[in-house]
Amino acid sequence: MSRSSKAVLGLSVLLTAATVAGVHLKQRQDRQRLRDGVIRDIERQNQKKENIRLLGEQIILTKQLEAEREKMLEKGSQNT
């Protein structure tokens, strides 16, 4: 084999190996990004559930406060 043939063969083997390695790295990054996305989605769902629970508590507390205010206003108007 001539020197130029060996050089071309070596270069093509090198480029092929680099391409295969690049594809594997890209796939690994994509899989990790997908896993991270699932974890973020689960965290968002948990946060949403917590926000809904807190909103429910706030609604209950607001109703209790309004009921107490009504009682206080009724007592105040009865005393005058």
UniProtKB/Swiss-Prot annotation:
GO cellular component labels: mitochondrion
Subcellular location: Mitochondrion
Predominant place of localization: mitochondrion
Domain of life of the native organism: Eukaryota
UniProt keywords, alphabetically: Mitochondrion, Transit peptide
UniProt xrefs under InterPro entries: Pet117
Residue range of the transit peptide in the UniProt record, numbered on this chain: 1-22
PANTHER family membership: PROTEIN PET117 HOMOLOG, MITOCHONDRIAL
Family (UniProt): Belongs to the PET117 family.
Name of protein: Protein PET117 homolog, mitochondrial
Taxonomic lineage: Eukaryota, Metazoa, Chordata, Craniata, Vertebrata
